Amino acid sequence: MAKSKVRIVFLCSSCGNEFAKWNGQCPSCSEWGTLSEYKVNTKSRTRSNGRPRSTTKMVDLLEKGKINRNNTGIPEVDRVLGGGILPGSMILLGGSPGVGKSTLALQIIPGLNSKVLYVSAEESEDQLALRAKRLGINSNLIHLSTENNAQVILDQVALLKPKLLILDSIQTIYSNNIDSIPGSPGQIRECGQQFLTMSKQNGVSVIVIGHVTKEGIIAGPKMLEHMVDTVLYLEGDPRFDHRVLRSEKNRFGTTNEVGIFQMSKQGLEEVSNPSELFLAERTKEVPGSAVFPALEGTRPILVEVQALVSNANFGTPQRNANGIDYKRLSMFLAVLEKRLGMVMGTKDVFVNLVGGLRISDPSADLAVITALASSAKDIIIPQDTVLVGEVGLVGEVRSVAKLDKRVAETEALGFKQIIVPQSNLKRFKKSNTKIKVLGVSSVKEVFSNLF
């Protein structure tokens, strides 16, 4: 019989790797001061007396056909997951406190129409029941547990045999194999590994809810994100009603799709037309406002960008960018000053994407730089005009992907004109649309048409 013994390891809180001795700098990820001491209960290594586990030919698995995903009943969630939850997959759902992680996890359950074990060490069973009642969820397929011991939870899974296990949250669960408090890097890694093994061996899907740090990353070792199959982030400012579900990692689908939701008394509600949501309160006839068709995955979303340029009367000029990359804003200001002769070095500059959105799509460049010029010159951009295009350092307007979808969404919302890169028009069929499509090759050409 294998003897249990305790060994000392040093675990990196950044990358999750363990080492036999302490170092000031992690040998794996090169971070400083991230190694902490942990006691691990292990069994002495002995040779297995049983027969080795058999292997499977890949061709035999392919002949079985496509594995069916389990639809959640929420199209926005299924879109981000790539078509639903794959049996035996492990999903990590992160987000800031109060953003709606637990609410979303509960709302997924009814659509699965399967037995689900919901484990919450943060709320009592009565509190969970009240939350489910508020969301209109009433099913005898849902089993609740407030256990926080990983071994006991695994025993509950073996007894109930659910199709889905929800852990809320991984930071509150501990394993007897690690001599440390719940939420420590060692505990998170050990518990994550145990639930991952169970998931793959039994075909049980697992949704792990994780807290995020003030830097916006999931708390705990990075190894947890490497373990799981899918990493989802639910984003949104608590001051606003809308939420955005993004995929940072997905072994079984794309990471480009997003799901848009709106928080209400009934929980998270899908937004079928995000463009109308983000343009609903747009102020008319004001300089510094422009609209562009962002492409999130395969879905175009019209978003308003606002810019404010004013004289810096209090020393060093301020630069503030919400929703876009700060370094990209600096590039736009340099292009305006160098290529168009606009003095921006003595100006306070503020840029904001309405609704608290965060966009990395470079096709927003033309709208942002035009909004900056509009505010600086105090000239209004026509309300029926949309701009799209990437801006280069020499002031050229470069092509963007999937222009046809962007134009179709723009036309559907009643806009009369869209300004696009000239290079895109070579492959674009104007006969398919009634909206005016104007091609430009430089920022200077855009300004001559608008200002």
Where are the regions that the model predicts?
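Peripheral, non-AAA+ core regions of ATP-driven protein-machinery
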Residues: 2-14, 18-81, 86-92, 99-115, ...
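Conserved Rossmann-like nucleotide-cofactor binding loop
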Residues: 124
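Conserved RecA-like ASCE P-loop NTPase motor core of nucleic-acid helicases/translocases
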Residues: 116-120
